[in-house]
Amino acid sequence: VDTPQGVKGYVQTGLFERSVLDSLTDIFPMDGVKVTYRLAEAEDKNWNEEWERNGFEPVRIADRILIHSPEHHSLSPAEYDIVIDPHQAFGTGTHHTTGMILERLLGMDLGHKTVLDAGCGTGVLGIFCTLKGAKSVWAYDIDRWSVDNTKENMLLNGVKNMEVVEGNASILQGKDAFDLILANINRNILLADLPSFVSVMHAESQMILSGFYVEDMPLLVQKAKSLGLSYLNHTEKENWATLLFERL
């Protein structure tokens, strides 16, 4: 769970090994970043039941998008209403990276566009694209929970022109080109997957990347340019960033 102070996580006491956590923080794959942590014993309660009952707070993006759980009722309407039951997947609009991509998409003409949602999480980005007129969305995630959750959220929103599969960027081999690619993952995976993304872009295809810090942008821009992409612009919010590219 993202908080203003960092990331909060939970693990069963019997499965926790401090030595493993220490070794992982020592090799954290971001230059110049030192990870610290503190431990506390959590209250003994049924956390799944708590999450199912309370969900997340409704999120409004640019006063035009409303993202909420099925449990939220009597909310003031919005131009785009998205129902998300996130379970264990990422993507409710509460994180700056998701919000910034949605803000970008609001200003884009998605009519009749084909969209790739890479690392889809809850599927919120792809679902929004269908609501905004995209011809079709093809999504994937390496996590089976996310794939199943995206399918559930597609049903909740009445989405029929979107497909989601389990896998990583290697499953893009042989796919037709997309008009728009969305990838909200992290710096290292993006750097590794950029060649696969470019392989399914045609001239004038665009790509929005996020899931990384402002200081990571030069590496990503350099890699993208080496693959024949043109940097268009970027956005920032509280040290998180998005990048927009176009294939030449």
Model-derived regions: residue spans:
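Conserved beta-strand segments of alpha/beta enzyme cores
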Residues: 36-38, 66, 136, 161-163, ...
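Residues that mark the start of a beta-strand
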Residues: 66, 81, 113-114
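S-adenosylmethionine
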Residues: 142-248
